[in-house]
């Protein structure tokens, strides 16, 4: 009796990390939408997309967690800059 899961199914840990990565990407995209200048907004959208695509093949858990932490810090920096620009 074989497993019903496809051979490429993610483990629970991989699934949770994937959800973290996707959540971070969504938060970055939402933050970038708030940037007033169209050229700056497009530049940062392209940058975020390229960064996530470039690291898509990463498989080491420690490296992925470090990239998530780095992305969260950059997102916080962007959110702070947007708050300062609004005030």
UniProtKB/Swiss-Prot annotation:
One GO process term, biological-process aspect: mitochondrial respiratory chain complex I assembly
Entry keyword Mitochondrion: yes
Name of encoding gene: lyrm2
UniProt function note: Involved in efficient integration of the N-module into mitochondrial respiratory chain complex I.
Keyword Transit peptide included in the entry's annotation: yes
Name of the protein described by the UniProt record: LYR motif-containing protein 2
Chief location: mitochondrion
Record-level GO cellular component terms: mitochondrion
InterPro entries the record matches: Complex1_LYR_dom (IPR008011), Complex1_LYR_LYRM2 (IPR045293)
Keyword annotations: Mitochondrion, Transit peptide
Compartments, as annotated in UniProt: Mitochondrion
Disulfide links within the chain: none
Highest taxon of source: Eukaryota
Similarity section: Belongs to the complex I LYR family.
Transit peptide start-stop: 1-19
């Amino acid at each position: 009796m074989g497993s019903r899961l496809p051979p490429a199914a993610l483990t629970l840990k991989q699934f949770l990390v994937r959800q973290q990565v996707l959540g971070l990407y969504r938060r970055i995209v939402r933050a970038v939408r708030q940037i007033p200048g169209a050229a700056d907004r497009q530049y940062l959208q392209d940058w975020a997309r390229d960064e996530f695509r470039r690291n898509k093949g990463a498989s080491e858990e420690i490296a992925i967690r470090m990239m998530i932490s780095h992305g969260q810090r950059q997102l916080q920096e962007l959110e702070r800059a947007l708050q300062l620009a609004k005030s």
